[in-house]
A protein has these predicted regions:
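Helix-rich terminal scaffold detector
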Residues: 1-78
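A broad, low-specificity signal for short, low-complexity segments enriched in glycine/proline
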Residues: 58-66, 73-76, 107-110, 120-123, ...
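Non-DNA-binding regulatory cores of transcription-related proteins
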Residues: 89-153
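Conserved hydrophobic positions within beta-strands
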Residues: 115, 160-162
Length: 167
């Protein structure tokens, strides 16, 4: 391959400008599902890394390798700091980490939220981080309790209808 258009300095510096992923200051509570997801992600990243290291010679590929290595450092740090919480050990009377909580808002709409670890949170499927304002409002509460969910667009009052834990 002709090297006429290759910026040698840029090629050697590939991956140097990758910013580390921030690690949360909070305890790293994870559900069994969350721990498995992190382990699966670690395996996937290792496979991608092996493939790219065997086939990459260009700057883009070296940048991609640096990104994967960065993500791998993050995932390994999260696995090392993981505090596994088994839902079976939680009180079914109280909203605790790992709970799926069914609530009703002031207009009668019923919603379900699953309180999970920070790396597991996904608002599109109603999995909320245990450090989120919603989870903080729900944690420690019982069925029939009313809580206020403080949101930037306005507070909502929620009544807890049901609490359960996946086994």
């Amino acid at each position: 391959m002709s090297r006429a258009f290759v910026n040698e300095e840029r090629f050697e510096q590939a991956g140097d400008d990758i910013v580390e992923r921030p690690i949360s200051e909070h305890p790293n509570y994870v559900t069994p599902t969350g721990a498995l997801s992190l382990q699966t992600l670690e395996g996937s990243l290792l496979e991608q890394l092996d493939t790219l290291k065997d086939t990459t010679e260009d700057t883009f590929g070296k940048d991609k390798i640096a990104e994967i290595e960065r993500d791998l450092r993050y995932v390994r740090a999260r696995l090392d700091s993981a505090i596994l919480v088994d839902p079976k050990t939680q009180s079914h009377e109280t909203v605790l980490f790992g709970a799926t909580v069914e609530v009703k808002d002031g207009e009668g709409a019923q919603l379900k939220f699953h309180i999970v670890g920070e790396d597991e949170a996904d608002a599109t499927i109603n999995k909320v981080s245990w450090v989120s304002p919603l989870a903080k409002a729900l944690l420690g509460q019982k069925i029939s309790d009313t809580v206020t969910w403080q949101r930037p667009v306005g507070d909502i009052t929620l009544e807890i209808l049901d609490i359960h834990y996946e086994s």
